[in-house]
Curated annotation (Swiss-Prot):
Name by which UniProt lists this protein: Chromodomain-helicase-DNA-binding protein 2
Domain of life where this protein originates: Eukaryota
Oligomeric form and interacting partners: Interacts with MYOD1. Interacts with histone H3.3.
Locations listed in the record: Nucleus
Basic and acidic residues bias: start-end ranges: 1-14, 81-101, 115-128, 146-155, 1037-1065, 1347-1371, 1396-1431, 1565-1574, 1697-1719, 1738-1748, 1759-1771, 1794-1813
Catalyses which reaction(s): ATP + H2O = ADP + phosphate + H(+)
Motif residue range(s): DEAH box: 617-620
Organism of origin: Mus musculus
Residues in Helicase C-terminal domain copies: 795-946
Compositionally biased spans, kind Basic residues: 175-204
Residues that coordinate or bind ATP: D509, E510, M511, G512, L513, G514, K515, T516
Biased composition annotated in UniProt, kind: Polar residues: 1584-1601
Region (CHD1 helical C-terminal domain (CHCT)): 1464-1566
UniProt entry keywords in alphabetical sequence: ATP-binding, Chromatin regulator, DNA-binding, Hydrolase, Myogenesis, Nucleotide-binding, Nucleus, Phosphoprotein, Repeat, Transcription, Transcription regulation
Amino acid sequence: MMRNKDKSQEEDSSLHSNASSRSASEEVSGSDSGSQSESEQGSEPGSGHGSESNSSSESSESQSESESESAGSKSQPVLPEAKEKPASKKERIADVKKMWEEYPDVYGVRRSNRSRQEPSRFNVKEEASSGSESGSPKRRGQRQLKKQEKWKQDPSEDEQEQGTSAESEAEQKKGKARRPVPRRTVPKPQVKKQPKIQRGKRKKQESSDDDDDDDEAPKRQTRRRAAKNVSYKEDDDFETDSDDLIEMTGEGGDEQQDNSETIEKVLDSRLGKKGATGASTTVYAVEANGDPSDDFDTEREEGEVQYLIKWKGWSYIHSTWESEDSLQQQKVKGLKKLENFKKKEDEVKQWLGKVSPEDVEYFSCQQELASELNKQYQIVERVIAVKTSKSTLGQTDFPAHSRKPAPSNEPEYLCKWMGLPYSECSWEDEALIGKKFQNCIDSFHSRNNSKTIPTRECKALKQRPRFVALKKQPAYLGGESLELRDYQLEGLNWLAHSWCKSNSVILADEMGLGKTIQTISFLSYLFHQHQLYGPFLIVVPLSTLTSWQREFEIWAPEINVVVYIGDLMSRNTIREYEWIHSQTKRLKFNALITTYEILLKDKTVLGSINWAFLGVDEAHRLKNDDSLLYKTLIDFKSNHRLLITGTPLQNSLKELWSLLHFIMPEKFEFWEDFEEDHGKGRENGYQSLHKVLEPFLLRRVKKDVEKSLPAKVEQILRVEMSALQKQYYKWILTRNYKALAKGTRGSTSGFLNIVMELKKCCNHCYLIKAPEDSERESGQEVLQSLIRSSGKLILLDKLLTRLRERGNRVLIFSQMVRMLDILAEYLTIKHYPFQRLDGSIKGEIRKQALDHFNADGSEDFCFLLSTRAGGLGINLASADTVVIFDSDWNPQNDLQAQARAHRIGQKKQVNIYRLVTKGTVEEEIIERAKKKMVLDHLVIQRMDTTGRTVLENNSGRSNSNPFNKEELTAILKFGAEDLFKEIEGEESEPQEMDIDEILRLAETRENEVSTSATDELLSQFKVANFATMEDEEELEERPHKDWDEIIPEEQRKKVEEEERQKELEEIYMLPRIRSSTKKAQTNDSDSDTESKRQAQRSSASESETDDSDDDKKPKRRGRPRSVRKDLVEGFTDAEIRRFIKAYKKFGLPLERLECIARDAELVDKSVADLKRLGELIHNSCVSAMQEYEEQLKESTSEGKGPGKRRGPTIKISGVQVNVKSIIQHEEEFEMLHKSIPVDPEEKKKYCLTCRVKAAHFDVEWGVEDDSRLLLGIYEHGYGNWELIKTDPELKLTDKILPVETDKKPQGKQLQTRVDYLLKLLRKGLEKKGTVASGEEAKLKKRKPRVKKENKAPRLKDEHGLEPASPRHSDNPSEEGEVKDDGLEKSPTKKKQKKKENKENKEKPVSSRKDREGDKERKKSKDKKEKVKGGDGKSSSKSKRSQGPVHITAGSEPVPIGEDEDDDLDQETFSICKERMRPVKKALKQLDKPDKGLSVQEQLEHTRNCLLKIGDRIAECLKAYSDQEHIKLWRRNLWIFVSKFTEFDARKLHKLYKMAHKKRSQEEEEQKKKDDSLGGKKPFRPEASGSSRDSLISQSHTSHNLHPQKPHLPASHGPQMHGHPRDNYSHPNKRHFSNADRGDWQRERKFNYGGGNSAPWGGDRHHQYEQHWYKDHHYGDRRHMDAHRSGSYRPNNMSRKRPYEQYNSDRDHRGHRDYYDRHHHDSKRRRSDDFRPQNYHQQDFRRMSDHRPTMGYHGQGPSDHYRSFHTDKLGEYKQPMPSLHTALSDPRSPPSQKSPHDSKSPLDHRSPLERSLEQKNNPDYNWNVRKT
C-alpha cells in the first residue's frame, strides 16, 4: 500500500514539470499510442493503476490473483512498464479536479441544482488510502463483519459510474453482463476533437447523477463530424467555450480507488427497522441469520423507509435493503435511480388515492407478479463453469464476488439465473450457492464428466439397427410418475420404425395430442436404446420454446439440453461454456433447442455441425420451398429429419410436396413429377397419394385417438345492437357513402377499412368513440354505461353471471386488444379474478399467467386472450368454456382458440359460445366464411382407409382477407337497409331476454357435425362437393339495393354539410400558412419546434380520415404515389418495412434477396415473392424519381415543403418510402458489390489496394482487417456487426465489438470506418473509369485560361476530381453538366461524375444534393445545344481554384470547405458572433416575427432582417482582399446566421441574394422613373451575364465597383455578393410557388441559380475574371444599378407562403436572350443595348405591379433602405465607421484588410475615374451600408 502511495506522490511531483509537453504529444498520439486509451482504466494489467482495481474481467489470471487479495491490501506493486509509459491524463488531473470540486466558480463550472451525492470522489486523502477500510462503504464493512469474508468489489464502478439516471435497457443488459469491464469515464480521445472530448468530460464531471451511458457520449460521435450540430438560437449555460477549457494535470489513479458501489435498479421499498440495512439483509444472510427487521414493531419504534437495491455488477441474490442514509454514507453512485423510483412511487400513491379498490387490487396483482419475477432471478437455473484462484479459465466477462482469503482452492461457479439470459451470468462462491443450489452444482459436474456425449463413431449413424417394437413404456421415459397414452406410445413406435427404415417423417397429429412428448420420447429412445447421444437440433417457434425445455426436464432429464437463444453476448457465452469440452474439442450437449430466427443468424455456426437428428416444430413454416428458411435448413447436415406440425397442408398440394421434399429429397425430388402422379386430374390420384404418403406421414385427430376427450359444443349466440351502436353503425355507413357508392370501382382496402370500423362498432361503442372522462360518481354507473354500449356485453354479462354460479372457468377471445381492455375493465369492476394474454405480454409474465390459471385450486375465473396471441402451444385445458367475442376473418384462428381448452387432459365438456351481432357485417362474414373456408383455409384430412383427402392445387388466399370486392360490397349492405328503416334518434334497445332462453334458441353445433374448418369438417365432404359449393354460393347471391336506396338522402346531406363546414374551418386555420417555410431544416431530423408545429397543425384538423397526417408528407400535388395493396399480396406492412430496411444494407439488392430475407426475418417467403417486392420497390422508386424531376421542370412549387428536402415519396401498400434514400443506398453499395470478386476463392484473397489511413482502434488493425470488414458488409449487410463478428471466415471475432464497451471498434466506429472505405473504393473505381476522358476534357478546358493560372497549388487528381469524398463533396458534378465554356463533359466523364454524385451521400444532411443534381442534369441536357455557342472567355469551371487544404495522413489533401458540413468550431463561432453583433436584433427577429402579422407582413419582416444581415456580412467581407478568405468567411458568417433559423446557410444566402436583387431592381425602376421625369439618362452599358457573374461572385473585387454619383441610389451591401450559382454542400431548399417559377426555371436550365454547379462562395468564375476585367471594366455598370436599389415593396399578389417574394420572376423569353444576358461574349454586342428603354420594366413586371415614385415609404425595414440621393444626404445621420472600428475583433487577420478601408464610404468620384482605378487595383472598396 505504502509503495503505491509513494509511487503516486512521486508521479505527482514529476508530472507538473512535464505536463505541458506531454499533453501536446498525447493529444496527437493518444489514439494510437494507447497512452490514454481505456487500457489505463484497468483493461491492461500493465497499465499502472488499472491493476489495482481487482478486475475480474480483464482475464481470469488477473482476476484470480486479485481475488486472493484481501480488501485491505488491494493495490499491487506498480509494474515497471507503467513508469515508462507517458502518464495518462487522468494521472495529471486529480489536483485540479479537487480544486474544481471545491471552487467550481474559479473554473467557470456551472453547478447543477441537483444535490451531489458523492463529493468525495475527488477527495485525494480518502482515495490515496486506496483499498483501506476507511474508503470502503459501510455496506461492505457490514458484510465483512457479518460473514467474516472479504467481498470482492466490482472495479467497473470505481470510476465508471458518475450516476446512472436513465440507463437504457440495452445498456443495462450489456453492463450487467460484463460488470467489471466497461470503464467509460475517459474515453480514448479522437485525435481531431480534443477540445470537444474535454468538454464532454467536464460536463460529465459536473453531474454526479448522470447515467453511465453518458460516459460513452464522446465515443459515440463519428469522426466525420468536426463539431456538434448545435442550434445557437440561445447560448446554453451548460456549454463551455473552448477558451474556458483548462488543461488538467495532477495525480491519476485516484478515481480507481473509489470503492463505492453503483445502484443498478431499485426493486422495492418498505418501512423497516432503523439500521437494518446492508449485507445482513440479503436473501442468503436472512436465511442463515434471520431478518434483522423481524422484531420491528411500527407502533412502538420509529422506522425508516428502506429500498431494495439491485447493485450493478452483482446478481439479484446480493440485493440488499438500504436506507437513504446508508446509501449516502457509502457514497454510492447512481442515486438518480433512487430519485426516479421515489418520484414514480409518489405518482403511484397519488393515483391509488384517486382510483377504485378494484384498480388498486389490479395494481397490487401486477406488483406481485413483478416481485415474483425478481424472486425468480435469485434462483440458479444452471451452473455453466467453475474456476478456482489457481485453475483459471482464461478471459472471463462476468462479475465475480470473491470473499475468500488469500490463495484458496475454493471454487467459484458461473451461474445462469432463472428467467435471465446467459449474458446475465455471474461468478458466485461455492459456499453461497452450495447451500441452496447444490443440485445445480451436481448436475454441472455430472454433465462435465458425462461419457454420454455425441460421437461420430456411433454405429447407429452408419447402419440403422433392426426395429424392435416397444410393447410398453420403457422405464427411462418419465420415470414412474409419468405415463404415455396408448396413441403416444404408438406414435413413438412409428417414429422409431421410420428411423430404423431410414425414413425421415412428418408427425402431423392434431393440435393437443402431445407431439412434443412423442418427439422427446423418441430422442430418449435413441439415447438409451441405441446409444445415439446426439447432437439433436430442434428448431421451434419462440412461443413454444419454454414448454419444450420443460418437457425435456420432465421426460428426459439425462439428456443435456441447451437452449440457444438470446443476444450476441448470451450466444457467445453459450458457445464458450456450454458448447465443447476444451480438452477433447467434442460437443458437450446432446440436444440444442433454438428458434428459426437465431438459426438464421448463426447458420454458419450451426450449419457446421453434423446433426444426428433435425426436428422442426410448427413445420408448416417450411411449406414454401422457395423461402430462405427452407433453403437454409435443407442444407444442414443431418442424419434424420422429423417435421412436427398440426397442419401439414394449407391451401395446396405443392405445400405438402415441399415438406416431403425437405425430409426425403431423393424420393420426392421434383414437384412436376409429384404433381403429374398425384394431381387432381387423376381419378385415383388421392388413393395413390395415400399409399405413397403412408410411410412418411402420421396424422391422428382427437376424436379418433382419445375417446375420453369430452365433446365440444359450439353455440352461436346472435345478439341485437344497443341503440347507441345502431346510431354509430348508421353514422359510419353514411359518412362513407361516397366510397360505398363506387361499388366494385372502389378500393378493396377502403372497403376493408369500413368493414373493420363496423366490426368495431358491433363489438363496443367505445372502440369507435371513447367516453368523455366525466367525473364518475360510482363504479356502478361506469359499469352500466360500459354494458349498455354493446349488445354483446349485455349478453356476456348475463352469461358470465350464470357461468360463475355454475363454477365454470372461461376463456374469452377477441381480435382487438382494445376490446380486451374494455373487457378487463368490466371484469375488474365486477370483481371477477382474471388473467390476460395478448401480444404485448412477454415471456416470463405470460408463462406465469398461464401457470397461475392452470394451477390447482386457482381462483381465476376468466382468461382474456387475443385470438392471435401466443401461437398454438398454449394449454389452458383447465378451462371448460370458450367465449369467442368477435370472430376472425379466418375461422381457423378461432379453431385454434377453441383447441386451447379442448385438449388432452380436459375432463369436462367444452362449451363454445360465439357472439354474433344480428343483421350486421359480422353475421354475414361468418356465413360466408363458413362456405368459403373449405377451399381457402386449413384443409388436411386424416389419413384413413377411406382415402378421403382434400388436396386442391389452387393456392388459395393466404392473406388475412378472404373476400373480394364484390363480396365485401355485399357484406357491407347486409342488414343496413333494415337498420336505416329505424328513425334516427328512435333506435330501439335490444329486448330483455332470459339467458336460458337465449341459450335454448342458439344455433348449436356438435363437434361431429361441425361446419368449422377443422379436419372433422372436411371428413364430411366428398371431393366432388367442392365445385358444386362454389356454384351454389353464386346462385344464392341475393339481389342488393344500391347505397342511395339504403341510406336516406337527408342523412347523406347532413354528413356532407358537416364535412363542408370542417373543410372551411381548415381553410381558415392560419397556422397552416407557415408550415412550409418552417419545414425546411438543416438536417432531416425534426426539431422540437417542428414537432410542436405539426402537433398544432394536426390539432387544427379534426379530420379522422387517412389524410390527417398529410402535413408530415412532402408537399406535392396529390398524395404520394401509391402501389396497390394487391401488388404486394402476401406481405404485411411490417414485413415490407423490414424488407426495405434490409434492402438498404446490400449492394445490388435484387441479386442478394436471400441475404435480405434473412436480415428482414422473411425467411419463409419465397424468393419469387421477395423478388417481386424488390423489383416493385426499385421500379417504383426509379419512376417516382423521374416523375418528380419532370414535375420540377414544370413547376418549382414543390420546392417549398419537405419534398424539396426529402425528395419524392411513394407508398408501397401502407408503407411510405423515401425514394431518394432507397436510390441513394442502392448507389452507395454498388461500388462495393462491383469491387468484390464473384469467385469464392478470389473472394477469400480479396484485399484493398488503395492506401488507407490508420484506424486508431484498440486492437491491431491493418488493411487485411479493412478488407475483411468490407467482405463482411458484402456478405452480411451494412450494420450487421454481430453477424460479421461471428463469421469464422472473416476472422474478426476478436477484433470488433470487444466486450468492454469502452474499447474500440464498437458499432459506431465500424460504421465510420466502412463509410470511409466505401469512399476510397469509389474513388479508386472512378479513377480507373475516367483516365482517358479525363485527359481529353482537361486539354479542352485548359485552352481558354492559359493567360492566368491560379497561384494556389493544384490538388486535384488528373481528372479534375476533388480529392474529397464524393459522399461529402460540396460540388458533385452532374451528368451532362454544361460548363460555362459550352463544352459538355465526355460521356465517360459524365458517367463517372454521375457516380460521384450518386455516392455523395454519407450524411443524411448532405444527401439532399443529389436530387438537385438530377434536376440540373435534366435541364442542362435539354439546353446543351444552345449553350455550346458560349465564348471561351467563360472558361471551364471543372477545375476549381485551390485554397487552404487539410492534409491527412494516408489520403489526398482535401480543400477546406469541401469536406465539411455546416458547422463552426468554437473559435470561428466566437469571431462570427463578434462580427455580427451590430445586427444582433435582426438575427433574433429573423425567425420570430411578431404575432398577428399578416402573411405579407411576415414576409416583409423576414426580408428586411435578411437584408440587414446580408449587408452586414458584405461589410465584414471588405476586410479581406484574398479570394479564399472572402469565400471562407462568407460561408462562416452565413452558417452563423443559419443557427438562428431553420434554413441552412445556403438557402439564407440565396434568399438574401434574391431580396437584394429585387431591391436593386426596384431602385432601378425608381431611378428610371426619376430620370424620365428629371433629365437625361446617363449612358450605362450593361454587363454581360458572364461578366456580371464573375464580378459578383468574385469577392476580391469590390461588390460595388462603381461609386454612386450623388444622384444615384446608394448601394446597399454586397450587391448579391455570392453568385446565384454559388454552390453549397446542400441543395437549396427553395420555397416558391408556381407563380414564382419563371426565373428559377431559366436558372435551372442553364445551370444558373443556386444549383450545384459551382463551389461555395462563387469561385466558379475566378479563373477567368481578371482576364475579363481587362476587356470589360465597364461591364457591370448597368447590371449593378439594377441591384442597387434601396427600396422595395410588398407584392400585391396574394401568396400562400412567406418566401415567395424573394424569387425574381421575369417573363419567359427566348433562351438566347437569357443566355446573352448571363454569359458574356466579347465579340458580340449585347442585344440589350438595342432594346427599348422600358424593357426592364417589362422584364421584371411580375415582381411588383405598383411602384411608388419615391423611396420606400415606410413599408420596409427602416430608413436604412431608402433610395439615396444627394438631396437626401442629410438623412444619413452619420456614415458607417471605418472598417477598422467596425471589425475590431482581435482575431480577424489584419493582413487581410483592404488598403482602402479607411476611405469614407461615401467617397464620390466620377464613374470614369473610379472605373479606371478599378482596372489597375484588384482590391476595391466596398460601399459600406449603415445597418
